[in-house]
């Protein structure tokens, strides 16, 4: 009895220990089952992804490639990440004691990669659903898609594509639950417990970040669309709310410019925007240069010298024509096609990809003004309306998205530009190689193929030099040998205009247009044949002596020098006698007459006024055509021979030297003093 009484307390104390061990065993069993569930479901999940990426996507080739890219998004990247993730999970099966801790470490290791790939897929999920709804409106297409899905994944049922597309979203949200289940069956004092806690928290953060990213993309998607609206459509969108919003923003901006309120500074974003604008400028410049290159290439291909008949039956010219024909029909056309497909089209796509970020940056500035106004009100009042809070969140979402993605975008654009430039250089190198290969056969038949390259270069330079000298001599000959001047009749009603030009510039500056002139530049004149002009300068601003600056009496501009000839306006003796008389009729200017017959009576030289001149100051004297004058000095006080000091009717003054002429007049019989 005593012995039995001694054993009874020990049996009661052993019962709790057995219950504790049994509880630990149950927790360990549940823990292992949770780990097994994680691995098994990961295997099934990865298999389903592979079916979508391989079997289903390959059978939906009748859909546009753009639709397939939206439907399956970056599913290939998800498969790559989850394949490595599953491999590491399966490796832990051989280490049962450390398996739970290893699982937690694996989740921590893949945290960033999982977030990067799944946030892209989740952000495009709504667009994929819109496409699925569009397909449902086309019964024949919907039946075709449904048949493919049911053949590959029978358990999809009537949901079809929607059942498959939602699987990645369900999986990323289930990871924290699976980890939480493992954590609940882990004793707190175990070494794996804190690791699992960090893993659960990390996966919850991943889902939170994905939701925030998705929200930012939804906000940004409203402003990245480039709409081509007409003026009427833009005006139709204007309402009182729009006017009020834009007026408030303008007021906020003016206050900042005036220094009344501070401007929000964001050095990080400003640096990223500056970098983006520089990258955009590089893309634009390269696109313009490639466009000009393609235009020049097209002009080069339009010129086909091999199609011209040179009337040369044989020799190097025929060989060159054969080579040129071969290059034009094959090498150059293929080069142009490759250039358009591998350089021009990617460059246009790159330029188009810049439009979305550009619109987003512009919209961020508008939202920044709204944000600053709301912040001011929040400091003053302490509360804001729901719409103001939404505007505040919109700016924060846009700013966070740009700061997060602009660095990657700028880097990708620069890499794309580098690849385009490398492709362009490679195409040029391939073209040069093809031309050399095709020319080798023809070069062997040319007369100087055995000459070394330096000597051949010298030979070509000498030949080109001789040809250039010949062309230059021909040009000089044609410039020197001009047709004899012909007298062009004055245009009707131009006498007064000619008189004005004479009184202003003198006869030595007057020229007549020999043929119609059609101006092509902004400063070129269009003049009819026979027009009288005054030369202002015998060259243009670039020093080209082939273009003269002239004055028509109303307009000034440039005309070709080769279409002008000096206009001689010396009046005849009969006209001089008539002008010297009492006849006050208007005087007509005529070209220089042929030499008069020798008079039968003695004559003497007399200086007369060839043209009328009106004095413009007290230092000048007026003249009448045919009026005799006395030259006192053949130059002015500065020695300028263009002005002469004369005496007329007892008055002295300066007149243009070009307005004076010597005329022969009969002398009276008798003695005369020598002049």
From Swiss-Prot:
Transmembrane segments: none annotated. Residues 506-569, 602-665 form the SH3 domain. Residues 254-455 form the BAR domain. It comes from the Eukaryota. It comes from Homo sapiens. Residues 30-213 form the DH domain. Keywords: Guanine-nucleotide releasing factor, Repeat, SH3 domain. PROSITE patterns: BAR, DH_2, SH3. Residues 1-26 are annotated as: Disordered. This is Rho guanine nucleotide exchange factor 37.
